[in-house]
């Protein structure tokens, strides 16, 4: 589906909801609908050509990249957009995300226009990937798997966490990653019990758990994967925790398919960990959508009301975090289909 087709699909949804226009401020949303990576703001009217508003330094790049959008530049893209909107017959306009100050400026400038939150509808459209998007994510996952291989080969007692991260980052760049999908995590020892432990200059100790969470970017699309290793020989306790998380992952993955409520997938993993005595140490949801953003819809949470559908790309990442002991997380990016989900990140899940 090209950007123009996405705009038309969005417009049909807007018409059903009585919207005359849609304001986009988030870079990922602007790229999804326009094809440009350099958008500041975008306006999609139902009955006029969509417009991309940028600063002067981004104008030429936006002009070259944008598909089906007029491109305008100025010192203040928001004011320029508001001037254009004042000349349109708009009664109800949606937005994806606005700061409070921008929302106040919008309401003051367009007093007769009703402004409504339309973020969920925008993300609902983005949640189902077309073949081109899947191909980009698949490549980002291939690159991430190479990064994990480099991390594994570098990781040993005495090596600093940041050195492991550097090796993985270099490998992914050499394979064609545009940037890390998110700040990489290499958390060792007791730090592995921090879900977002980042990476430090800490030297990895012998026999310690090491959580490595990384992702690559290709054509703007992200990947996300986590492995947990032991620097040396694993203890019985470490193996016990790791096997529990692996079973939770495997059981949950069996449930990742078209039509299954997202909460059921989360609860499948949660029940495994509860049965094994680790339920209270699983402190986040099971997964999230992946695309132009590394965290998007659908959300695999016990509180979710969403259903998985064919074309969703999600993570499956059960974990156990025990303060003072360490953590184990296993994660793949997977593609939802009619049958068993396809794992797009493929590096082995071996503990050692």
Question: Model regions: which residues?
Answer:
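Active-site neighborhoods and metal-handling regions in enzymes and metal-associated proteins
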Residues: 1-352
């Amino acid at each position: 589906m090209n950007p123009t087709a996405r705009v038309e699909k969005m417009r049909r949804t807007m018409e059903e909801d009585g919207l005359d226009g849609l304001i986009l401020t988030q870079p990922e949303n602007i790229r999804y609908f326009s094809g440009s990576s350099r958008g500041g703001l975008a306006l999609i009217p139902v009955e006029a050509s969509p417009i991309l508003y940028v600063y002067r330094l981004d104008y030429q790049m936006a002009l070259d990249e944008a598909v089906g959008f007029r491109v305008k530049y100025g010192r203040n893209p928001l004011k320029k957009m508001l001037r254009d909107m004042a000349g349109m017959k708009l009664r109800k306009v949606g937005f994806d995300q606005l700061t409070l100050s921008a929302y106040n400026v919008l309401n003051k400038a367009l007093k007769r226009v009703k402004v409504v939150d339309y973020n969920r509808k925008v993300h609902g459209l983005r949640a189902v990937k077309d073949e081109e998007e899947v191909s980009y994510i698949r490549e980002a996952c291939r690159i991430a798997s190479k990064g994990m291989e480099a991390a594994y080969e570098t990781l040993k007692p005495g090596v600093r966490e940041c050195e492991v991260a550097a090796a993985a980052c270099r490998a992914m760049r050499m394979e064609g990653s545009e940037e890390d999908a998110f700040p990489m995590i290499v958390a060792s020892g007791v730090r592995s019990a921090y879900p977002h432990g980042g990476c430090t200059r800490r030297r990895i100790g012998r026999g310690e758990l090491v959580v490595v969470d990384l992702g690559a970017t290709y054509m703007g699309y992200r990947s996300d994967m986590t492995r947990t290793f032991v620097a040396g020989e694993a203890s019985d306790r470490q193996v016990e925790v790791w096997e529990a998380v692996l079973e939770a992952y495997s059981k949950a993955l069996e449930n990742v398919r078209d039509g299954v409520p997202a909460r059921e997938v989360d609860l499948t993993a949660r029940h495994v960990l509860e049965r094994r005595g680790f339920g209270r140490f699983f402190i986040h949801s099971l997964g999230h959508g992946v695309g132009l953003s590394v965290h998007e819809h659908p959300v695999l949470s016990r509180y979710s009301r969403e259903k998985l559908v064919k074309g969703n790309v999600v993570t499956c990442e059960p974990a156990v975090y025990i303060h003072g002991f360490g953590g184990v997380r296993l994660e793949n990016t997977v593609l939802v289909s009619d049958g068993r989900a396809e794992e797009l990140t493929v590096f082995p899940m071996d503990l050692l």
